């Protein structure tokens, strides 16, 4: 075997062994799903790790819309959007999103990851400055690091730190308009970005604001319009993803006309990717309608969150949030896995989230509630958490 092959094999083996020793080794679980439960190796477990916040992933109206879309448009789009992959269902969804969220345009992508990276790889150049919250999603951080622009980071939700960076950028690069990037809801902590204050700072320092609202759109704001609506601000660029509250997959970049056209001309993630199936876009249109009409889903999420905190013992360090994401910080990765497995043994699926997804020594259980859960489900979760945590 050539030396280069042995070197790669050694590197891979060493990295895997190190990750396992650190309690950070990740494995996929092959699951099937029905309602709010998952089935693993023949066992039914109540699922508290899904991002299907509004319970739309298995809603009959969404399933019917996708089946209708298959009949109308076939299985796949057949090409990238600039060839023959842009269909009437895609156009209808883009127009619907733009009207609902108050933007000139919506541009569809296959994932939130690709939408974020398309924006940050395409719009900034080497003369620009990106300013990001330190807890932003990996897709944003990776794109910032690989972007030709200069990237600066500020401590999580720290307005003073953001203001200092904006002042420094304005002083050092007076002709540059910085791009400030944050999430609306932070996926691992469930907390909200102080968008009203951030937007004010952006206005004062002539900066653009980009908000990734993957976990806020559909859940927060009037008719589910998201974190920006809740805060009363309009981001220059808004990222909406469809793998959470929409119950499907994909994403859209919300922006003005010129920005949309710029991305169409220059964003490689857009130009060189096959479009999402038009049947999927048809189903997403149905999801968008339900999100706007079904206020009861958001009201139920609020009530279930309150019920959980009513029933969990005060000694348990469950973080109260205004979102369906309820983190329980454990700290040690091995212990987080142990607690997760103990819950699994009692019929609850609650995933342990460990570094590098979260900072070192902040491993946690990421508990998520959905509108598909019942009050009985929440009481069972609380009772089991009380038992398991007290036993640890």
Curated annotation (Swiss-Prot):
Keyword Transferase: yes
Pfam families in the cross-refs: Aminotran_1_2
EC id: 2.3.1.47
Cofactors (names): pyridoxal 5'-phosphate
InterPro entries associated with the record: Aminotrans_II_pyridoxalP_BS, Aminotransferase_I/II_large, AON_synthase_class-II, AONS_Archaea/Proteobacteria, AONS_Proteobacteria, PyrdxlP-dep_Trfase, PyrdxlP-dep_Trfase_major, PyrdxlP-dep_Trfase_small
GO BP annotations, alphabetical order: biotin biosynthetic process
Sequence positions bearing N6-(pyridoxal phosphate)lysine: 244
Pathway named in the protein's UniProt entry: Cofactor biosynthesis; biotin biosynthesis
Transferase listed as a keyword: yes
Catalytic activity: 6-carboxyhexanoyl-[ACP] + L-alanine + H(+) = (8S)-8-amino-7-oxononanoate + holo-[ACP] + CO2
Gene3D superfamilies found in the cross-reference section: Aspartate Aminotransferase, domain 1, Type I PLP-dependent aspartate aminotransferase-like (Major domain)
Residues engaged in binding substrate: 26, 137, 357
Assembly with partners or alone: Homodimer.
HAMAP family documented for this protein: BioF_aminotrans_2
Family the entry assigns: Belongs to the class-II pyridoxal-phosphate-dependent aminotransferase family. BioF subfamily.
Protein name in the entry: 8-amino-7-oxononanoate synthase
Protein's gene: bioF
